[in-house]
Amino acid sequence: MAVVTMRQLLESGVHFGHQTRRWNPKMKRFIFTERNGIYIIDLQQSLTDIDRAFSFVKDTVAHGGSILFVGTKKQAQEAVAEQASRVGMPYVNQRWLGGMLTNFQTVSKRLSRLKELEEIDFDDVAASGRTKKELLMMRREKDKLERTLGGIREMAKVPSAVWIVDTKKEHLAVAEARKLNIPVVAILDTNCDPDEVDYPIPGNDDAIRAVGLLTRVIADAVAEGTVARHGGSAPGEAGTAEEPLAEWERELLQGDTDEQSSAANTEEPTPAEAEALEAPADTPAEPLAAEADGETVAEAPAEVETAAEAPAEAEAEVEAESATPAEAEVEAESATPAEAEAETPAESTDEQA
């Protein structure tokens, strides 16, 4: 599957070239036709060249290389900075300093100076040990270095390849790259020289949407190459590659997946545990000790109620036993204490006889 479709190229205006009077005859093979005094670029060849450049960039990054994004014209500054930052690659979107590649040793010294200035706290005058004027001059130096070298702050060596927007404007970058035999991948408009570029992509280098689309394609190739270099799988759909993850992010995501799987295994009871829960327990287990204590406490009020009901039942039984015929009650009530004492000795005498 192509990394970009013909419809996307047409919507972005990649097929528009320069005026017919501003052209390079070497670009004739990439021109489809002329309309209203403007050349129309053959997008079929552009698609083929995009796939070729995409594969080259992906393989270069997969083998540990780096890509330098270069685009100092206003139409390309934002797209170059955004896409290069997304994939963690160096970029130059302001002024190209002469010798940035051929004299990289000197440039690396300026990068070290920039990092030193970034560590200074310009707001704390007393702690810095410098005067306000010195701090002001150093702040201006820092701002200037950030503007020109901020995009290549982390570039420790010469890049493996260079992505360039508008080779005519960036002729210094093209010359330095060719001198160092660094492959050049670039957008070629109808006024450019294709012999200076190793992997040309015929297209419009003046439209913001066209530059943004092609730069995003190269950034996607860098992203896929980074994923392949770290042993990951490439994204399913070409042209929509996601930003490569760092190693600590991969470990964090892997740890979250393991925790979720272990939690799922803990929540689901095993068949043996399910049978144990369904079967009645003959003897109380240790985990049920708390429940047993709760049941004992709950039964205590019931025992108190039973004890309170016992006297009432005893009184009822006494009343039932005392329920004798009316005559017996009358005799019992009419008997005096004297008669009761007289009857007692008589009964004892008869027993002795």
Curated annotation (Swiss-Prot):
The segment annotated Disordered runs over: 256-353
**A GO biological process this protein is involved in?**
translation
The superkingdom listed in its UniProt entry is: Bacteria
* InterPro entries found in the cross-reference section: Ribosomal_uS2, Ribosomal_uS2_bac/mit/plastid, Ribosomal_uS2_CS, Ribosomal_uS2_flav_dom_sf
- Keyword Aminoacyl-tRNA synthetase among record annotations: no
Stretches with biased composition (Acidic residues)? 340-353
Q: Does the keyword Transferase apply?
A: no
Ranges annotated as biased composition (Low complexity): 263-311, 321-339
Query: Which molecular-function annotations from GO does this UniProt entry contain?
Result: structural constituent of ribosome
Q: Please give the Pfam families that the UniProt record associates with this protein.
A: Ribosomal_S2
Q: Which UniProt keywords apply?
A: Ribonucleoprotein, Ribosomal protein
Tell me which GO cellular component terms the UniProt record holds: cytosolic small ribosomal subunit
- Parts of the chain that traverse the membrane: none
The record, for NCBIfam families, names: rpsB_bact
Similarity comment? Belongs to the universal ribosomal protein uS2 family.
Mind telling me what this protein is named? Small ribosomal subunit protein uS2
- The organism of origin for this protein: Beutenbergia cavernae (strain ATCC BAA-8 / DSM 12333 / CCUG 43141 / JCM 11478 / NBRC 16432 / NCIMB 13614 / HKI 0122)
